[in-house]
Amino acid sequence: MSAETPINVVGGGAWGTALANAAAGAGHPVTLWLRDAGAAAALQAQRENPRYLPGVPLHPAIRATGEAVDLAGARATLLVVPAQTVRGVLESLRGPLATAGPVILCAKGIERGSDSFMSAVAEQVLPSGTPVAVLSGPSFAIDVARGLPTAVTLAAADAGRAAALSALLSGPSFRLYHTDDVRGVEIGGAGKNVLAIACGIVAGRGLGESARAALIARAFAELMRFARPFGGRPETLMGLSGLGDLVLTASSPQSRNFAFGQRLGAGASPAEAAGGKLAEGAFTAAALAGLAAAKGIEMPVAAAVAAIVAGTASVDDVIAGLLARPLRGETD
């Protein structure tokens, strides 16, 4: 394809807009698709996303559209929609995506009901042989949109494709490292959202920085235990998409998952804590805990978050239960 063949970004939220800016900053024309044609027209006219990224200009190389036909014939397509909507969006765009290059999944989560990771969902929906990749790592949309230095991981089963896509999307301030460990990257992204809620609860309860540091370390140990039976590699979890993303989202109120947990810790109900905003970890918690239980993987922090979100346990009872667990070797 020519250098003028666009890169698609499907999804006009904060992260989709930020990735569109990053791809345009890497020297590519970008087609930014929004489900709402009116919102797409407004974005195209205003050259800004006032709802999600007010004050951040849209790169001149971005064209916003609400027409699915505009997605055909791209070099690659970044799917940037919430994890629980990935299947529906892929089904609705299956036709144009057949000629839209590799599909890069940017949602971090596990589908409720099927307990499927995002790459598995894509493989179930897209035509056989459609190349699929996953992008994940420590990144806030506002930082990427403003061109602040950020590094993430791109994974594809074909190592050569992973390297090529990373090179395609990397720019002056947005660096992509590549791997063929798709499942390891997905586990890091989905799992850290759940564990970031736990860290937010600790902050909201005023339990101190020492408690939060201990929780981050123990939560990371849970991710490592979970990854092995599902084929994720330890070195992947120790990189950007695992430990890097966990540290970022477990330490900052900019993270929706951390902020959700913080409100839970301060006494809000799950519905009140959500406040109409998406916290992917709230949807992933039950799936993560269920998958772990089915394989006999001990994940007490993830299970505690799932119970709190489901309303079957109180924050105080969960904290008391975790503190009463038997002492053990640190690496057991």
From Swiss-Prot:
Any one of the GO BP annotations: glycerophospholipid metabolic process
Binding residues annotated for NADPH, in chain numbering: 15, 35, 108, 141, 256, 278, 280
InterPro entries hit by this protein: 6-PGluconate_DH-like_C_sf, 6PGD_dom2, G3P_DH_NAD-dep, G3P_DH_NAD-dep_C, G3P_DH_NAD-dep_N, NAD(P)-bd_dom_sf
E.C. number(s) listed in UniProt: 1.1.1.94
Keywords: Cytoplasm, Lipid biosynthesis, Lipid metabolism, NAD, NADP, Nucleotide-binding, Oxidoreductase, Phospholipid biosynthesis, Phospholipid metabolism
Record GO cellular component, one term: cytosol
MF GO annotations: glycerol-3-phosphate dehydrogenase [NAD(P)+] activity; NAD binding
Highest taxon listed in the record's lineage: Bacteria
Localization of this protein: Cytoplasm
Pathway: Membrane lipid metabolism; glycerophospholipid metabolism
Coiled coil regions in record: none
Active-site residues (renumbered): 192
Binding site for sn-glycerol 3-phosphate: 108, 137, 139, 192, 245, 255-257
The reaction(s) this protein catalyses: sn-glycerol 3-phosphate + NAD(+) = dihydroxyacetone phosphate + NADH + H(+); sn-glycerol 3-phosphate + NADP(+) = dihydroxyacetone phosphate + NADPH + H(+)
Disulfide feature: none
One Pfam family it belongs to: NAD_Gly3P_dh_N
Main location: cytoplasm
HAMAP family documented for this protein: NAD_Glyc3P_dehydrog (MF_00394)
Role noted for this protein: Catalyzes the reduction of the glycolytic intermediate dihydroxyacetone phosphate (DHAP) to sn-glycerol 3-phosphate (G3P), the key precursor for phospholipid synthesis.
Family from the record: Belongs to the NAD-dependent glycerol-3-phosphate dehydrogenase family.
Name listed for the protein in its UniProt record: Glycerol-3-phosphate dehydrogenase [NAD(P)+]
Gene expressing this chain: gpsA
